[in-house]
Amino acid sequence: AAMLHNSGFEQYEISAYGKTPSQHNINYWEFGDYIGIGAGAHGKITDIKTKKVFRTLKPKSPRDYLVEFSRNDIESSAKVIDNLTFEFMLNSLRLKDGFNVELFETRTGQPFQVLNSKLDKAIDLDLIQIQKKCIRPTKKGFNFLNELQEIFL
């Protein structure tokens, strides 16, 4: 980590360093939508009308992928995400700078208050901090990210 820092790279995510953060990665960690194209590809799509969030998974085999593609059967590979709060926290807490309260509400469709009791527990354990509507892991929380994420399970 010191060698990367001395070379101008900063850690912006638990497993990523860069001179500037990767926008693709940031979108993923901020629970944004992305389209999976091709054999074995994964995607995440939000249906604006129903407020449902879907994960998509394409068949790994190129032959099976082409069969599905020729049927134009998007629904068969889409699964509704049941626990949006946990999925959001699982992703966003990986970011060193955390996330904004409004982002949580926009991406999950839930009021931020649904997190209150779990945030209180994480704060009591010195794993998370809240500053100006921004939630981020403390240094301890970043070092013990699995334990922090488990609180929101």
Regions found by a protein language model. Give the residues of each.
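Short secondary-structure transition/capping segments
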Residues: S22-I26, L125-I128, N143
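Minor-groove-contacting beta-hairpin "wing" of winged helix-turn-helix DNA-binding domains
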Residues: C134-T138
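A short, conserved structural fragment
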Residues: E13, I123-K133
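Hydrophobic alpha-helix feature that most strongly marks membrane-spanning transmembrane helices
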Residues: R94-G98, G109, D120, L127, ...
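Basic amphipathic alpha-helical segments that dock to polyanions
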Residues: F104, L115-L125
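Short, amphipathic alpha-helical interaction segments positioned at domain boundaries
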Residues: K140-L153
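C-terminal scaffold of the Radical SAM
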Residues: A1-Q110
